Amino acid sequence: MPATFGQVVIGPPGSGKSTYCNGLQQFYNAIGRSCCIINLDPANDRLPYSTLNSLDIRDYLTIEEIMEEKNLGPNGGLIYLFESMEESLDIFYLKIQEILTENENTYLIFDCPGQVELFTSNGTLFKIFQKLSKKFDLRLCVVNLIDSIYITSPSKYISVLLLSLRSMLMMDLPQVNVISKIDMLSNYGNKDELLPFRLDYYTEVQQLDYLQPLIEIESENIGYKYTAKKLSKLTAHLSEIIEDFNLVTFEVLCIDDKNSMVSLQTLIDKANGYIFGVSEIGGDTIWSELTRQGIMNELNMVDIQERWIDNKDEYDKEEEKKRLEAIKQKELLDKEVNIQENNTDGNEDDEWGRIMKDWENATGKVASANK
């Protein structure tokens, strides 16, 4: 059996994990890559994606059952569930084995819960994926989603940097950090006052000391006047730790934007190794062609500040125009194919008529009207 590839989707509550999995499923279906979503959140009873080709942990155990049986709260119940699951993975093994037996090239997408302690302080989730990786030769990449609203506050931005760094160290897997819902960023305020720095400052994670004066002002504005300087010093030390590790950077994602998805998935495929010679085996030839043609060079030339903040409306209009043109081209192509098929059917009828005429002349009999 060849190596199995996949993504582990993590992130705080509300960061868009299930929405991302839904969009990813549609994207992979479009490029011909077989995939399966595995929901690991026992509290998520409203899945936006199709459950026909997915595995749902709620089919076996729900958080409500754990809470009632063990008299635990939501977070405690979730940790208990994963600790129990880590000790006995037999059923989980069998279900994944069934999926891979049906199609050994299936790409696995793990939709994880939003409780951050599972991937920052509790090692159970890491142990589960470690065992799965050994069992099925899994090549996984962690996709850490962060809501774009967090970069509008300097202190919240530092907190998500710490969260991302901690998850990278805890999960011990290749990790791509993503600022999700980037298209919503312009809705959070006037674009001239929305961010004190350009968007690429927040994605490249450099020169964090520039945030110190802003954090002091922010602390004073929310009523922490007497502790503002202490908070600023604490933030300075935390910023030094983040910069010393030099591990955290961010990509941006709009789930409805094709170019944004192509750019992100190319990076993820490089991180887990899928892109290196496996795409043909997986059958997603369209994706292979996109990569070979160097589409990423074109996408990387787009300035994210200009695309998502300065000139977002103009870019959106241009993308919509391209989308409508693509739909029109497809309709014309389908129409041409139908015409060719009809002509082929007509030619077949003419050929059949000639054959029957020759048979009648040779035998002196009248052929039936039915073929």
What is each PLM-predicted segment?
Residues 1-30, 36, 97-103, 107-108, ...:
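P-loop NTP-binding site
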Residues 2-10, 15, 19-128, 133-139:
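Nucleotide-state-sensitive switch-loop elements of NTP-binding domains
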Residues 8, 145-152:
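Short, basic, glycine/proline-bearing loop/turn elements
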Residues 37, 142-144, 177:
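Structural beta-sheet core signal
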Residues 40-43, 147-148, 180-183:
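Short, ordered loop/turn segments at secondary-structure junctions
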Residues 45-48, 117-120, 151-155, 184-195, ...:
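Switch/connector loops and helix/strand junctions flanking conserved nucleotide-binding motifs
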Residues 133-137, 166-173, 241-244:
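Arginine/glycine-rich "motif VI" loop of SF2 helicases in the C-terminal RecA-like domain
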Residues 151-172:
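Amphipathic helical hotspot of TIR/SEFIR-family domains
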